[in-house]
């Protein structure tokens, strides 16, 4: 029939309840040991959900195919997680989109590739990005395919600017990745393509800063990649990585910037007028700052010295709000008819809040990579400024309590039927690898949840508490059997990345109709099932193409 925004009434659940939708960032479920910061932390609120109402607590999948990523080995992340939570359906995402475009060859027919190809005759193609198979920001096999494809489509001179990982993969693996890359480049040279590594550095020290935390990181990369200037000069990437790990004893994440030079000591690949540049990461957050420096004419955050006239494209578009970069090799998923848009069309007043580092997740990504309000009369979004210029283990409580206070006030105001927040501690503090600080962060997050639940109790509302992916629940690298791994000196290897763990979802509150419980027939439920669940709690049936609801209402 004819499309309509109007949702059918739920046969058993009433409309008009105030619903708190709480997303704990980086909060998975794992076995309770000393590396599970959620277990170690005092988290009485989250514990009570599981203990007191087991029929209203369960685990859902937040990684791999459940969120549109290629395989079950792909960790979830905040962007795809919030897309799934808000959209109610599973869309091919990030790496998967790139895989499909590379496999079909569509990537070479797109506007973005054609744009960079215009420079192949006279200029150099530069590829900049994270060199690892971590699958969080980039994947080595995609770089390998793109190198091969670019050469087949006419690139005559190629320079690769590598960023070493050691954060999403084990420290020290960058040597092997560099060896693989250099072998591929050697094969291209045998085929007559002038291809080599031009520069490099560790991801946390060179280029890959995020949220404008430290522009010096981007400047160090710019100096090496664009200007060909760096404190260290080497003949090859493998030599560079090996030597810098010995002296100044840097780990992969923090390798100082280096350039590759020829026998005369001249850098082999600065970026100059007439060149093409592609940033090969598919994940956006740590490419946005470099993209600004490469694209914005009137950029003044640091002195670029030279602003080369180049054709620049991202692997994907990194910021839909800023339309940045304006050219990209792979188009984003078209996410239409998100739950937020439906609910606003059906009279649900909505409040959303987080601090800067996750504000975009609870708004832009939740709404299907779309900026702004659906209807400003019906919605209010509040951003609390995050602490800047520090790593979050220094302030592990972050703005959890401030976010909860805003949510509480919104709930008690009576103006909103949905109050949606993201509490970032588990993820942002977990990424620092500081176990003690992460424990403090998890406790603060639990206190924030309590404050929101208390407000829901006061207004007779309903709460839904879940997470977007794991992080804080497992802070150690493990071997295949699950045993913690140590480095050569016997020191435990800390895991700073997201995980493959499922995440909890709990529902409750005085407004919840008695007899509502989780269904037993959706064992593989994931984040995308949450949207239909929340629509039901608002008193509506979900659209027929949404992933099925997790709940049922049984007559008592």
Curated annotation (Swiss-Prot):
A Pfam family (short name) is: Metalloenzyme
Residues the entry annotates as binding substrate: 137, 167-168, 203, 210, 283-286, 358
Q: In which pathway does it act?
A: Carbohydrate degradation; glycolysis; pyruvate from D-glyceraldehyde 3-phosphate: step 3/5
- Location in the cell: Cytoplasm
GO molecular function terms here? Answer: manganese ion binding; phosphoglycerate mutase activity
**Catalytic-site annotation from UniProt:** 78
**What's the catalysed reaction?**
(2R)-2-phosphoglycerate = (2R)-3-phosphoglycerate
Query: Which cofactors is this protein said to need?
Result: Mn(2+)
> What GO terms fall under cellular component here?
cytoplasm
Q: In which tissues is it expressed?
A: Found ubiquitously in germinating seed.
Cofactor details (free text): Binds 2 manganese ions per subunit.
Give its E.C. classification number: 5.4.2.12
Primary enzyme class? isomerase
Residues noted as binding Mn(2+) 2 in the record, renumbered to the chain: 25, 78, 468-469
Instruction: Name the keywords, alphabetized.
Output: Cytoplasm, Glycolysis, Isomerase, Manganese, Metal-binding
> From its record, what is one biological process in GO terms?
glycolytic process
UniProt cross-references to InterPro entries, sorted A to Z? Alkaline_phosphatase_core_sf, BPG-indep_PGM_N, Metalloenzyme, PGAM_B_sf, Pgm_bpd_ind
SUPFAM superfamilies in UniProt:
2,3-Bisphosphoglycerate-independent phosphoglycerate mutase, substrate-binding domain (SSF64158), Alkaline phosphatase-like (SSF53649)
Task: Report the domain of life of the source organism.
Answer: Eukaryota
Q: What family is this protein classified in? A: Belongs to the BPG-independent phosphoglycerate mutase family.
Q: What is the role of this chain? A: Catalyzes the interconversion of 2-phosphoglycerate and 3-phosphoglycerate.
Q: What is said about its interaction partners and assembly? A: Monomer.
**Name of the molecule in the record:** 2,3-bisphosphoglycerate-independent phosphoglycerate mutase
Species = Ricinus communis
């Amino acid at each position: 029939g004819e499309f309509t925004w109007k949702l059918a009434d739920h046969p058993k659940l009433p409309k008009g309840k105030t619903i708190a939708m709480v997303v704990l960032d980086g909060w998975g479920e794992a076995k309770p040991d000393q590396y599970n910061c959620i277990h170690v932390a005092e988290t009485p609120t989250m514990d009570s959900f599981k203990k007191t109402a087991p029929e209203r607590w369960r685990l859902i999948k937040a990684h791999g195919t459940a969120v549109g990523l290629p395989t079950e080995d792909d960790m979830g992340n905040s962007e795809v997680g919030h897309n799934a939570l808000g959209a109610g359906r599973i869309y091919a995402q990030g790496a998967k989109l790139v895989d499909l475009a590379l496999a079909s060859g569509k990537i070479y027919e797109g506007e973005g590739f054609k744009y960079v190809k215009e420079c192949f005759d006279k200029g150099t193609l530069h590829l900049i990005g994270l060199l690892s198979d971590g699958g969080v920001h980039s994947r080595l096999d995609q770089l390998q395919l793109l190198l091969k494809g670019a050469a087949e489509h006419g690139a005559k001179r190629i320079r690769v600017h590598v960023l070493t990982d050691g954060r999403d993969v084990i420290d020290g693996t960058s040597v092997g990745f560099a060896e693989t890359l250099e072998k591929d480049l050697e094969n291209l040279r045998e085929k007559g393509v002038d291809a080599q590594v031009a520069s490099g550095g560790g991801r946390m020290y060179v280029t890959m800063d995020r949220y404008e935390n430290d522009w010096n990181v981007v400047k160090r990369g710019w100096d090496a990649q664009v200007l060909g200037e760096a404190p260290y000069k080497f003949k090859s990437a493998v030599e560079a990585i090996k030597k810098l790990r010995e002296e100044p004893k840097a780990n992969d994440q923090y390798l100082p910037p280096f350039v590759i030079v020829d026998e005369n000591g001249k850098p082999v690949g600065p970026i100059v007028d007439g060149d093409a540049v592609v940033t090969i990461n598919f994940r956006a957050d740590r490419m946005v700052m470099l993209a600004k420096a490469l694209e914005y004419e009137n950029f003044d955050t640091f002195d670029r010295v030279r602003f080369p006239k180049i054709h620049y494209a991202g692997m994907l578009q990194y910021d839909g709000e800023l339309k940045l970069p304006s050219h990209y090799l792979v188009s984003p998923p078209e996410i239409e008819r998100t739950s937020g848009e439906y609910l606003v069309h059906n009279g649900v007043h909505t409040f959303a809040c987080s601090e800067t580092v996750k504000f975009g997740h609870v708004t832009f990504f939740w709404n299907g990579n779309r900026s702004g309000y659906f209807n400003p009369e019906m919605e209010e979004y509040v951003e609390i400024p995050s602490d800047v210029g520090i790593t979050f283990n220094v302030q592990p409580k972050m703005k959890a309590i401030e976010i909860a206070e805003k949510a509480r006030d919104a709930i008690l105001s009576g103006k909103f039927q949905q109050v949606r927040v993201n509490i970032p501690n588990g993820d942002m503090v977990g990424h620092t690898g500081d176990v003690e600080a992460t424990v403090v962060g998890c406790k603060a997050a639990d206190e924030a949840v309590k404050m929101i639940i208390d407000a829901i109790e006061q207004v007779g509302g309903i709460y839904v508490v879940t997470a977007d992916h794991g992080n804080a629940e497992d802070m150690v690298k493990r071997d295949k059997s699950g045993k913690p791994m140590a480095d050569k000196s016997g020191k435990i290897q800390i895991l700073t990345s997201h995980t493959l763990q499922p995440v909890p979802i709990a529902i409750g509150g005085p407004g919840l109709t008695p007899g509502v419980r989780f269904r037993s027939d959706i064992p593989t439920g994931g984040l995308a099932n949450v949207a239909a669940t929340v629509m039901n709690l608002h008193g509506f049936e979900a659209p027929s193409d949404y992933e099925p609801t997790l709940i049922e209402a049984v007559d008592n």
